[in-house]
């Protein structure tokens, strides 16, 4: 049986969403067919990310700032502040469910985008776009819904299961309570869930030195980053 070659494409240059006065380009490929899960695993371990049925990675000319990052669950050491955030939400009910979009999730998503990313592309997403973000996946994907004891939905994390870990695809949350630190809490929970499942790493996407949007990721240590074809501790990362 002949296998068709895996095709990769390069996008046209576009404004960088993370650093001013820079241009981004991506290489992408479709995740489809019986080998989609295996391909997703290999590409994730090589620094790619998933959106819908597409795996992508930055290939920007003259810039290597976007650095794939993952957290080794076994050696993760929460800071004192992170421990306080975790203990603050011990009453939350967490439900892990299939990637099925709901109106309740979408309302939370819209409020999150309007406050946190009003100028981003996702701020203009309609219900159909949101449903595609959640449900269009060729791999093993789940949602974690975080609810208060009264049932109020406060945070949602979309995650993929890989052969060696979990991949945090997208998280959104209640922006009305700034003291809750839902973003930090969700990452702490995902690290714990990675360990609970007996997996090694939580893949966090791209760390971008100099980008305020991505600075929070360096707080979860000790993280590993992927550069020059290998994973190494962030402390060994040279400037981009």
From Swiss-Prot:
It is found in: Cytoplasm. One of its GO terms (biological process) is ubiquitin-dependent protein catabolic process via the N-end rule pathway. This is Aspartate/glutamate leucyltransferase. It catalyses: N-terminal L-glutamyl-[protein] + L-leucyl-tRNA(Leu) = N-terminal L-leucyl-L-glutamyl-[protein] + tRNA(Leu) + H(+); N-terminal L-aspartyl-[protein] + L-leucyl-tRNA(Leu) = N-terminal L-leucyl-L-aspartyl-[protein] + tRNA(Leu) + H(+). The gene is bpt. Functions in the N-end rule pathway of protein degradation where it conjugates Leu from its aminoacyl-tRNA to the N-termini of proteins containing an N-terminal aspartate or glutamate. It is an enzyme of class 2 (transferase). GO terms for cellular component: cytoplasm. SUPFAM superfamilies: Acyl-CoA N-acyltransferases (Nat) (SSF55729). HAMAP family: Bpt (MF_00689). The keyword Cytoplasm applies. Keywords: Acyltransferase, Cytoplasm, Transferase. GO terms for molecular function: arginyl-tRNA--protein transferase activity; leucyl-tRNA--protein transferase activity. Its main location: cytoplasm. Its EC number is 2.3.2.29. InterPro entries: Acyl_CoA_acyltransferase, Asp_Glu_LeuTrfase, N-end_Aminoacyl_Trfase, N-end_Aminoacyl_Trfase_C, N-end_Aminoacyl_Trfase_N. Disulfide bonds: none annotated. Belongs to the R-transferase family. Bpt subfamily.
């Amino acid at each position: 049986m002949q296998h068709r070659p895996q095709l990769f494409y390069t996008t046209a240059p576009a404004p960088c969403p993370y650093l001013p006065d820079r241009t981004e380009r991506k290489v992408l490929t479709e995740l489809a067919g019986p080998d989609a899960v295996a391909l997703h695993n290999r590409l994730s371990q090589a620094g790619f990310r998933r959106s819908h049925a597409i795996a992508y990675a930055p290939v920007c000319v003259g810039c290597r700032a976007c650095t794939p990052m993952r957290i080794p669950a076994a050696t993760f050491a929460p800071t004192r502040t992170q421990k306080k955030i975790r203990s603050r939400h011990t009453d939350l009910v967490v439900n892990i469910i299939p990637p099925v979009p709901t109106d309740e999730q979408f309302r939370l998503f819209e409020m999150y985008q309007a406050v946190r990313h009003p100028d981003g592309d996702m701020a203009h997403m309609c219900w159909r776009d949101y449903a595609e973000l959640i449900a269009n996946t060729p791999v093993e994907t789940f949602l974690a819904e975080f609810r208060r004891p009264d049932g109020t939905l406060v945070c949602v994390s979309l995650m993929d299961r890989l052969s060696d870990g979990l991949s945090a695809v997208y998280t959104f949350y209640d922006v009305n309570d700034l003291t809750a630190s839902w973003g930090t809490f969700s990452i702490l929970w995902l690290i714990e869930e990675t360990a609970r499942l007996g997996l090694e790493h939580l893949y966090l996407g791209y760390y971008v030195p100099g980008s305020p949007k991505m600075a929070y990721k360096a707080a979860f240590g000790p993280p590993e980053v992927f550069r020059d074809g290998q994973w190494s501790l962030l402390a060994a990362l040279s400037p981009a």
